[in-house]
Amino acid sequence: MSEYLLEMRNIGKEFNGVKALDGIYLKVRAGECVELCGENGAGKSTLMKVPSGVYPHGTWTGEIFWEGKELKASGIRDTEAAGIVIIHQELMMVPHLSVAENIFLGCEPTTGGFIDYDQMNARAAELLARLKINDINVALPVYHYSGGKQQLIEIAKAINKNAKLLILDEPTSALTASETRVLIDLIKDFKKQGMACVYISHKLDEVAEISDTVTVIRDGAHIATRPMSELTTPDIITMMVGREMKNLFPREPHDIGEVMFEARNISCWDVTNPGRKVVDDVSFALRRGEILGIAGLVGAGRTELVSSLFGVWPGACQGQVFLEGKEIKIRTPRDAVRQGICMVPEDHKRDGILPIMPVGHNMTISVLDRFSLRGLIDKDAELVAIQREILRLKVKTADPMLAIASLSGGNQQKAVLSKMMLPDPKVLILDEPTRGVDVGAKYEIYKLIFALARQGVSILMVSSEMPEVLGISDRVLVIGEGKLRGDFPNENLTQEKVLAAAIGKPATNAA
């Protein structure tokens, strides 16, 4: 019997003549968790679509061996029958079907030729109980549940398919800390039962906790495979980016001027429960060239607050907004952009891009009037601007006219940043700007934020990553249960002090 459950040898893959994978090797033993590391666009997701059958045999080069025998899968049905199941970064749920229907989709139990819903619900509940998931009603539609709960439902679906190898692509990018904990504990249990796992994540603390082996790829090529016990986080980062990165937060001095933007008594109401406030009488000021971080627990009201300031919160809002001392009215994003306020949304795939449009057009869509002459677009001038932005943000794309959906998540995020920087904003709102982005791309985004601050742009940044908030902010607002719980200059500010304010413990207002 083979030592390895899965062995991939010399795997290559091309798209339109461009090499995405070039001679990659990967080995996974039963009961082992292999972490696949690399920058955005390195080829991690592309590589995992090979053994999972998304790319059938013949569309790639090399060899795959499964339980010692060569695997030539013609599609996902073949690989799932073998026991290889992938859970993509974008969850494959049917929102209006029940939890049980999603778990058994395509393999529904039947009686007399009809779907047996009682049996399906009972088996789904039993499956979730086996996974120690007791707070999900299998009869409810999936859309009732958070992204974290949906991730667990996807895992239950994989277990129902008798998975021997579970491939998880950025499983915790949109999860809360408690949801992440549940997922990590599940993976540890799976390993004890002999299930193997390939885990893709940019959160290197998770990598250290659950991985036995780390394989690093860069620009589609295999860089190294090492036992996790021999590596430190800086070692992994150096292999990923090809250079030593001593300081993740490249702080540079920048002048902070007069008040540029002011929000007074902002309140917002829940869309589904109009009697409940999600933002409750929040006021703050933002100065020219200042980086103002907004911290708080998930669900505290941070996204709701910044969405209202950009005119995208769908519920009722009230309060006043001032720009350079003058009151302004913002009812739509168009109003905000015209006033010099731009925003990079939390969910860039849903709210920030037009997936089937080219990368370049996604960048310039907010400033097309700049390239317009008598109603016609000057394509040459537009292309010059696009190429300049691609170089400035180091967006990895073979061609700016490729659909943006073909790019990795991190490169899509850079394109969204570019779109919101091209209008030359006075105020830039960033909601989770580095979510799902690798360490190298984070570093580039941080450098960009500091460069904008030096140019006098006022930056309002929401982040759930506390080191990020403390690493780049000049001042930190803390939101809890929709209220402003703290306003702290970032001098000797600690995670403990921010967390204490977020959960409602006494915290001194220091600004």
Curated annotation (Swiss-Prot):
SMART domains: AAA. It holds the Pfam family ABC_tran. It is found in: Cell inner membrane. Residues 6-244, 261-506 form the ABC transporter domain. GO terms for molecular function: ABC-type D-xylose transporter activity; ATP binding; ATP hydrolysis activity. InterPro entries: AAA+_ATPase, ABC_carbohydrate_import_ATPase, ABC_transporter-like_ATP-bd, ABC_transporter-like_CS, ABC_transptr_XylG, P-loop_NTPase. One of its GO terms (cellular component) is plasma membrane. The complex is composed of two ATP-binding proteins (XylG), two transmembrane proteins (XylH) and a solute-binding protein (XylF). It catalyses: D-xylose(out) + ATP + H2O = D-xylose(in) + ADP + phosphate + H(+). Part of the ABC transporter complex XylFGH involved in xylose import. Responsible for energy coupling to the transport system. It is an enzyme of class 7 (translocase). Belongs to the ABC transporter superfamily. Xylose importer (TC 3.A.1.2.4) family. It is a peripheral membrane protein. Its main location: membrane. Its EC number is 7.5.2.10. Signal peptide: none annotated. Keywords: ATP-binding, Cell inner membrane, Cell membrane, Membrane, Nucleotide-binding, Repeat, Sugar transport, Translocase, Transport. It comes from Brucella suis biovar 1 (strain 1330). It comes from the Bacteria. PANTHER family: CARBOHYDRATE TRANSPORT ATP-BINDING PROTEIN MG119-RELATED, XYLOSE IMPORT ATP-BINDING PROTEIN XYLG. This is Xylose import ATP-binding protein XylG. ATP binds at G38, E39, N40, G41, A42, G43, K44, S45.
